[in-house]
Amino acid sequence: MWNLFGKKKKEGEHRTLQLITDKKMPFGYVEAYKSLRTNLDFMAGSMDVHTLVITSTVPEESKSNVAINLALTLAESGKKVALVDCDLRKPVLHRYLKAGHNVKGVSNVLSNQCTLDEALQELKEMNLTFLPAGTPPPNPSEMLSQPQMQAMVDTLRQK
């Protein structure tokens, strides 16, 4: 496997995200995410867009990197942001946001093990709300396609 900068990963090595909040990040890297944010705002125009989904077809395509950095740039611009980790198989966002492992999250809310408010984490220093993936379920695809998922997203939109 290769990382974002073309270096081959060692077996068992965790990938590292390049967060725009890191003062060592090159100016061009940070500006690319700000440009993406601006372009999304421009494309939305007068539409009332409140939800973005970042996904990919295969692992290791940097969807987590894009999701977290786009969330950070949106929050930095004053928008209310809820970053939801729906990778129920191999969640990683909690690691980069220092949210702890096996905390309550999406899977726990959808299986009625906790409320949405109990699972949400306010990351005040980043100006965003984070909903971790939660406990890995045996049926991630089915869990995300149930009606409760849409209800959860609708509730988050109103917060």
Regions found by a protein language model. Give the residues of each.
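P-loop NTP-binding module
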Residues: 1-159
